[in-house]
């Protein structure tokens, strides 16, 4: 299927894609399994942004990215999950795929 996306939600010249949320690691900010996530493709984000990230080539995950001086923190928004702190060479294995721009719920 497809999701109609109003042009005002998009910046021209940038690439976007939709993902369907899996898991419950971001429920405290209202992202639940089955929700649709509009992601703007980009390989870097600001500290505090919610992004699609893969580590060590693993499946992509949606987490809040917090940048520290010598570390990168992947913070879930559910206290049942632990944050992942990456330091040193571990940070080289992190690949940001894009930034969350919009959440759409389907009932």
Model-inferred region functions:
Residues 1-107:
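Acidic/glycine-rich C-terminal interaction modules and beta/coil loop segments
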């Amino acid at each position: 299927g497809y999701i109609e996306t109003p042009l005002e939600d998009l910046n021209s010249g940038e690439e976007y894609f939709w993902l369907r949320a899996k898991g419950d690691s971001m429920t405290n900010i209202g992202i639940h399994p089955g929700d649709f996530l509009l992601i703007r493709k980009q390989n870097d984000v600001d500290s505090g942004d919610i992004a699609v990230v893969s580590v060590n080539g693993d499946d992509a995950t949606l987490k809040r990215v917090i940048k520290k001086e010598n570390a990168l923190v992947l913070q879930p928004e559910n206290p049942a999950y632990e944050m992942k702190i990456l330091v040193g060479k571990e940070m080289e294995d992190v690949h940001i795929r894009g930034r969350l721009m919009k959440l759409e719920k389907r009932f």
